[in-house]
Amino acid sequence: MTRLNVKPTRMELNNLKARLKTAVRGHKLLKDKRDELMRRFIESVRENNQLRQKVESALVGHLQDFVMAKALESDLMVEEIFAVPTREVNLHVETENIMSVRVPKMHAHIDNPHTDDEGDVVYSYVASNSQMDETIESMSDLLPDLLRLAEIEKSCQLMADEIEKTRRRVNGLEYATIPDLKETIYYIEMKLEEAERASLVRMMKVK
C-alpha cells in the first residue's frame, strides 16, 4: 500500500472517502462485467470447438471426394468447372454489443444462379461427372458454417482482449487504488484525531 501525497485535512478526507466509494462501486461493476464476459467467452469457445470439428471433418471428406472426382476429369475441364461460381453471396456485417465489446454479426444471402429448374448445377457448356457436381455442391453447403465459424472466432478474440483489459483494471483497483485510498484515509483520520487531542490539551492548559 502507498499513502497518497495529500494534506491531512477534513475536506481532503471527505474527497478521499467519495473516491473510495466510487472505486469500490467501479470494482464491483468491472468484476461483474469480467464474469459475464468469461461466461459468454466460454460458451463461444465451446460452440467454436464443436463447429470447427464439424467443418474440418466435412472438409476432409469433401476433399477426398474431390480428389476422386478430379481423377475422372482433365485438368482443363476442372479449371473450366471452377471458372463458374456455383453460389453468389451477399454478405452484410453488423456488430452486436456484448458487455461493451462490439462483436461481428454476419448476415449472408446465398443465391444459386447457376442451377436449372430442378436445382441441378449447370456449368455453361462444361459437362462434368456427377461425382464432381455432388462434391462441389457439398462444399458450397459448408459456406454458412464457415461464415459462422469466422464470426465466432473473431468474437472470441475480441472478448479475450476485453477480458484481459478488464482483469487488469479490476486488479489495479483491488490491489492498488482501493488499498492506497484506505491507507490514506486511515492516515488522515489519525492525524485529525491527533490534532483534536492536541487542541483539547491546549484548551485544558489554558483553563
UniProtKB/Swiss-Prot annotation:
Molecular function in Gene Ontology = ATP binding; proton-transporting ATP synthase activity, rotational mechanism; proton-transporting ATPase activity, rotational mechanism
Which superkingdom?
A: Bacteria
Pfam entry (one): ATP-synt_D
Protein name per the record: V-type ATP synthase subunit D
Gene coding for it:
atpD
Transport recorded as keyword: yes
Q: Which GO terms describe its biological process?
A: proton motive force-driven plasma membrane ATP synthesis
| Function of the protein | Produces ATP from ADP in the presence of a proton gradient across the membrane.
- What keywords were assigned to this record? ATP synthesis, Hydrogen ion transport, Ion transport, Transport
> Which family is this sequence assigned to?
Belongs to the V-ATPase D subunit family.
